[in-house]
Amino acid sequence: MLQSLAGSSCVRLVERHRSAWCFGFLVLGYLLYLVFGAVVFSSVELPYEDLLRQELRKLKRRFLEEHECLSEPQLEQFLGRVLEASNYGVSVLSNASGNWNWDFTSALFFASTVLSTTGYGHTVPLSDGGKAFCIIYSVIGIPFTLLFLTAVVQRVTVHVTRRPVLYFHIRWGFSKQVVAIVHAVLLGFVTVSCFFFIPAAVFSVLEDDWNFLESFYFCFISLSTIGLGDYVPGEGYNQKFRELYKIGITCYLLLGLIAMLVVLETFCELHELKKFRKMFYVKKDKDEDQVHIMEHDQLSFSSITEQAAGLKEEQKQNEPFVASQSPPYEDGSANH
């Protein structure tokens, strides 16, 4: 009997602190995922780094042997200056010095990468004034960009996600959850095709040194705002229509980021994912826990603004696709 009482008390203890246990496992899983990534990257990339270091040492030794009039400290000083300039986007190579980094189109591309926090790092401000302006520009521009993306994604989601799902639910009587899942998968497939596969094929043709994998890698690194900077389009020697090309890339990155956020918002609104997310939230038991800045169920871009604002109030009996927090849609909008 004591064992049964102890077992039941343990079960009650686990159930009472279920959210804390789930959160603990979430933190542990994230840390393990970080360690897993570090182990894989280290095991894959470290041998290549070692080979490259050996190759550079051999080239340096051979160069000094062929040019005995040049001392090693002089060569080190020259290479250090070249590498320092390269870090600022200026190359000493004759076939790479024809493109300016701070003409208008290049500056426009740089501004877009700063505001979207992609930041390839291939071009950086050279002057103290440019660095100071970059700080001020980013402090104002990044929140402005978040507000802009929030408004755009909210409006696009209404027309691209909620109204189509509501249309099939009301007009054809399909289950809303099933329609939402199918719609999210189709939307993800279309987005990947239009903003990853097709642009990757285009970049592999326009960029001389890029294959399809490298082009796809650039698209993913850019639209996920990782922006490593190892691949930057439009930097080739004598790039044709470089100004127009840079403007097109800027538009592609902006539209692609919006598309990615719309897909993310669509998946976040799925009922199953909402239930899964709530497993890691703090359970609101007390009245003071109810007062907070952001609702737990509103960790998405479209939740910052009102959902589907301006729709008629007499259609409240039509349940929206998201949750009860979003105002219902018009019947007329679903029949378009």
UniProtKB/Swiss-Prot annotation:
There is a cross-link at K274 (Glycyl lysine isopeptide (Lys-Gly) (interchain with G-Cter in SUMO)). Residues 104-116, 117-122, 212-224, 225-231 dip into the membrane without crossing it. The keyword Amino-acid biosynthesis does not apply. Residues 117-122 are annotated as: Selectivity filter 1. It is found in: Cell membrane; Recycling endosome; Apical cell membrane; Cytoplasmic vesicle. Pfam families: Ion_trans_2. InterPro entries: 2pore_dom_K_chnl, 2pore_dom_K_chnl_TASK, 2pore_dom_K_chnl_TWIK, 2pore_dom_K_chnl_TWIK1, K_chnl_dom. GO terms for cellular component: apical plasma membrane; brush border membrane; dendrite; endosome; inward rectifier potassium channel complex; membrane; perikaryon; plasma membrane. The record marks T118 as: Important for increased permeability to Na(+) when K(+) levels are subphysiological. Residues 310-336 are annotated as: Disordered. One of its GO terms (biological process) is sodium ion transmembrane transport. Detected in brain and in kidney cortex and medulla, especially at the renal brush border membranes of the proximal convoluted tubules, in distal tubules and on intercalated cells of the collecting duct. Detected in cerebellum granule neurons. Detected in astrocytes in hippocampus stratum radiatum. Highly expressed in the stria vascularis in the cochlea. Detected in neurons in Scarpa's ganglion in the inner ear, at nerve terminals in the crista ampullaris, in supporting cells and dark cells, but not in hair cells (at protein level). Keywords: Cell membrane, Cell projection, Cytoplasmic vesicle, Disulfide bond, Endosome, Glycoprotein, Ion channel, Ion transport, Isopeptide bond, Membrane, Phosphoprotein, Potassium, Potassium channel, Potassium transport, Synapse, Transmembrane, Transmembrane helix, Transport, Ubl conjugation. Residues 1-20, 157-181, 268-336 are cytoplasmic. Residues 42-103, 123-132, 203-211, 232-243 are extracellular. Inhibited by 100 uM quinine. Slightly inhibited by Ba(+). Activity is first increased and then decreased when the extracellular pH is lowered to 6.0. The chain crosses the membrane at residues 21-41, 133-156, 182-202, 244-267. Residues 293-299 are annotated as: Important for intracellular retention in recycling endosomes. Residues 225-230 are annotated as: Selectivity filter 2. Sumoylation is controversial. Sumoylated by UBE2I. Not sumoylated when expressed in xenopus oocytes or mammalian cells. Sumoylation inactivates the channel, but does not interfere with expression at the cell membrane. Sumoylation of a single subunit is sufficient to silence the dimeric channel. Sumoylation of KCNK1 is sufficient to silence heterodimeric channels formed by KCNK1 and KCNK3 or KCNK9. Desumoylated by SENP1; this activates the channel. Desumoylated by SENP1; this strongly increases halothane-mediated activation of heterodimeric channels formed with KCNK9. Homodimer; disulfide-linked. Heterodimer with KCNK2; disulfide-linked. In astrocytes, forms mostly heterodimeric potassium channels with KCNK2, with only a minor proportion of functional channels containing homodimeric KCNK1. Interacts with KCNK3 and KCNK9, forming functional heterodimeric channels. Interacts with GNG4. Identified in a complex with PSD and ARF6; interacts only with PSD that is bound to ARF6. Interacts with UBE2I. Ion channel that contributes to passive transmembrane potassium transport and to the regulation of the resting membrane potential in brain astrocytes, but also in kidney and in other tissues. Forms dimeric channels through which potassium ions pass in accordance with their electrochemical gradient. The channel is selective for K(+) ions at physiological potassium concentrations and at neutral pH, but becomes permeable to Na(+) at subphysiological K(+) levels and upon acidification of the extracellular medium. PANTHER family: POTASSIUM CHANNEL SUBFAMILY K MEMBER 1, POTASSIUM CHANNEL, SUBFAMILY K. This is Potassium channel subfamily K member 1. It comes from Rattus norvegicus. The lineage of its organism: Eukaryota, Metazoa, Chordata, Craniata, Vertebrata. The gene is Kcnk1.
